[in-house]
Structure formats: structure tokens, C-alpha cells
């Protein structure tokens, strides 16, 4: 009964674990959740007011499928001001979240058998979306001892005549890694050499620490920009995950037109009032965003300090987003709380059932020796949860 293309697609473990954790809390379990990939802050008041006012002004009807012109213009201005990228409103598609933008891209650019380079560890939906579009994910393992740096020799070996695109995610979910300008430039050069499209997921661009700055790979040259599709959105930066507004930009009119056509036959336009709210979001002072980023940085420092105190766990310092990706391989093969730890699913199940802590198993991101912790939660929760993890792993 089910289409073959969906039989090879697994469910989102991150959403599944978050749903289970929320149900346990609803059932009265004293649970600490590190699974959710969304800010725990409220949407800023000015943005909420813009959405409310849009509804009161009856901004409740269809818009063009690719988004309202005013929001496209605001996105184009954002790219120019913040990323040094010149796009026309006609180069931009507004979608129902950055995840939707990515889905649209793969559906638009992939033919059966086309390969897509995905750096591993990777965000859970990249590989599944590529498979839905009848593409083939090709994984390139990042070098953990070198802070999840790219192995360019390995990358070159993975590129074939079937390779159509590569995905660049900076800052990274799940590792928090931020590739250097030199690494991004090398990636851009390789993409030009092999005539590959670059899908650049920049959704966490404003959540960067240690004084580092975000660089869009599309900004290196006109040639690189011409082969890059930039994806972003308002969800993570402005605590608007439920508003469902993402966007993409590309110089390639054929790709943009194809995505516009696809979206017109699937979701049509994103919700009208949330598009209006997104315009206000893009006008929000940087000080508001920086206040949230500063709080995330404090939590990042705390979670690293607490992990430092748990023997057997190691990690690479995250420089962006709000995740950390501890390596627990020293526990593999051991029995903890009556459960043999063969991989990350075993560890996550043990922590959930015995310690009442929800984490995301690393296998969801292509790395079975790790688990992901989101520090988009309170300092008190971080301390409470790490107390429980430390006790469980004694």
C-alpha cells in the first residue's frame, strides 16, 4: 500500500524523542529534556504584535505561492546588509520553514540516482529528504579529532559523475561546528571544479560564539553564488519555530521557477499572517537577538563545564547553534543499569528510562558513538540533567 520511495525513509528520531518526552512529562514524570531543537525563549513582543495586527487587518487570504513581495524585499535587504549578497525579490521563495525550503530544493534538482554529498555527522532530515527525492546520500565523515574539520582528500574521492550537489551546514546541527573561512573557500573551489550545486543551510547563522563571524559560502565570488542555493529562516534566530517561515535564494532562475511551481501544487503560500510577522522579525534590533545568543553562550559554557566532570565523555567545543555532541565510545560494550550499551540507541533508552533524561541518539545524525544535547533549556535544567547523567554513568 505504501509507495516504495517512502519505505526507505525513516522517521525523525529527534521529533519522536521529543514527542515521547512531552508525553512522559504530561504523565507526571519528572523528566529533563535535552532533545528539542528550538529556543526556549518566547517570540519577541513586536513580532507577536505584528502577527496579531495582521489578523485584525484581515491578512488572512491567499498570497502568491512563493510569498508576499514585501517579505521577499525584506529578505533581499537582509542578505545585502548582513551577508553581502545581492538578490532580487524574484530570486527568493518563502516557504513553510527552512526544512520545507530544503525539501523543495531536493525535489527540484534531483533526478533518480543523483548523488548528494552530506558531511557526517549531519542533520537528521538531509539524508531522508534526498531519498524522498530519489537521490542518493553520499556521506563524508568529518574529522572529530580536528574539531569536525572537513577531510578534503576524502571529499574528492566521494565525488563521482553522479554527484549533483553538496550540503553545507554552518553552524552545524548536531555538532555546533563552524567551518573556517579557509575550509569554506576550499569547498567552494571544489564545487566550482566539479560543477556541483551548493545547498547552504544557514539557519543558525546568528548563534555563533567565541567571537567568530558567520560567512555565507555564496559570498566568495559571483561564480560560487551562481551555484549556491542559500537557505535560512526566522525560526531559530527569533524564537519562531511554530510560525513556520523559511526562505531560499538562488541566482538560478530555472531552479527558483521550478520550486515556485512545486510549492504552488503542494502547500501554496505559507500562512499570510506569519509572513507579515516575519517582516517585523527581520526589522528586530540585533540587540534582541544578541541577548538570546548571549544567554545560549552562558548555557554552552555551563554544559561544557559539567561534561568535563563526567569521566569517559569527550566532546568538541561547539562554536555555534545550541547543541553539543558528546562522544561516549568508552562506555560501548559495558552494562549500565542492567542494559548493555551497544550503541547510541541503548544509551538514550537507558538515560530516558533510568535517569529520566531525554537525549537524541547519535545514530540519528550518522554517528553511533555520540548523543546530542540541546542547551536550549534553562541553566537549572542543565545542572539537573547533567547531575542525572553523571550519576547514571558512574
Q: Where is each model-derived feature located?
A:
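PLP-dependent class I/II
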Residues: 2, 6, 10-12, 17, ...
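Generic structural signal for well-ordered alpha-helical scaffold segments
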Residues: 22, 76, 80, 106-107
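Conserved N-terminal alpha-helix of the aminotransferase class I/II PLP-enzyme fold
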Residues: 62-95
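Glycine-rich phosphate-binding segment of PLP-dependent enzymes
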Residues: 43-62, 76, 81
Amino acid at each position: 500500500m505504501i509507495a516504495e520511495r517512502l519505505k526507505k525513509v525513516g522517521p525523525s528520531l529527534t521529533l519522536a524523542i521529543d514527542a515521547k518526552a512531552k508525553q512522559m512529562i504530561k504523565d507526571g514524570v519528572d523528566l529533563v529534556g535535552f532533545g528539542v531543537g528550538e529556543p526556549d525563549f518566547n517570540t519577541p513582543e513586536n513580532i507577536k504584535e505584528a502577527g496579531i495586527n495582521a489578523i485584525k487587518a484581515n491578512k488572512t487570504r491567499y498570497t502568491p505561492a512563493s510569498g508576499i513581495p514585501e517579505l521577499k524585499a525584506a529578505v533581499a535587504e537582509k542578505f545585502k546588509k548582513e551577508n553581502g549578497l545581492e538578490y532580487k525579490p524574484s530570486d527568493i521563495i518563502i516557504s513553510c520553514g527552512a526544512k520545507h525550503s530544503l525539501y523543495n530544493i531536493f525535489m527540484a534538482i534531483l533526478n533518480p540516482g543523483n548523488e548528494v554529498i552530506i558531511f557526517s555527522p549531519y542533520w537528521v532530515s538531509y539524508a531522508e529528504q534526498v531519498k524522498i527525492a530519489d537521490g542518493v546520500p553520499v556521506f563524508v565523515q568529518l574529522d572529530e579529532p580536528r574539531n569536525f574539520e572537513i577531510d578534503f582528500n576524502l571529499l574528492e574521492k566521494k565525488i563521482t559523475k553522479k554527484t549533483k550537489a553538496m550540503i553545507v551546514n554552518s553552524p552545524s546541527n548536531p555538532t555546533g561546528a563552524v567551518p573556517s573561512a579557509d575550509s569554506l573557500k576550499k569547498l567552494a573551489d571544489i564545487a566550482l571544479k566539479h560543477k556541483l550545486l551548493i545547498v547552504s543551510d544557514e539557519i543558525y547563522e546568528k548563534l555563533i560564539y567565541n567571537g567568530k563571524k558567520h560567512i555565507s559560502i555564496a559570498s566568495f565570488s559571483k561564480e560560487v553564488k551562481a551555484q549556491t542555493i542559500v537557505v535560512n529562516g526566522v525560526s531559530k534566530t527569533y524564537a519562531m519555530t511554530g510560525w513556520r517561515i523559511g526562505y531560499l535564494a538562488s541566482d538560478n532562475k530555472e531552479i527558483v521557477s521550478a520550486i515556485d511551481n512545486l510549492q504552488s501544487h503542494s502547500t501554496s503560500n505559507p500562512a499570510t499572517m506569519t509572513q507579515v510577522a516575519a517582516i517585523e522579525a527581520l526589522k528586530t534590533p540585533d540587540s534582541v537577538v544578541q541577548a538570546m545568543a548571549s544567554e545560549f553562550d552562558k548555557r554552552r559554557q555551563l554544559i561544557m563545564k559539567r561534561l568535563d566532570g563526567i569521566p569517559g565523555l569527550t566532546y568538541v567545543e561547539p562554536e555555534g547553534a545550541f547543541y553539543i555532541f558528546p562522544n561516549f565510545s568508552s562506555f560501548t560494550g559495558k552494562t549500565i543499569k542492567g542494559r548493555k550499551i551497544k550503541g547510541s540507541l541503548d544509551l538514550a533508552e537507558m538515560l530516558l528510562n533510568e535517569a529520566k533524561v531525554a537525549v537524541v541518539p547519535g545514530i540519528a545524525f550518522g554517528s553511533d558513538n555520540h548523543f546530542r544535547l540541546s542547551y536550549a533549556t534553562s541553566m537549572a535544567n542543565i545542572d539537573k540533567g547533567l547531575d542525572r547523567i553523571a550519576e547514571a554513568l558512574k
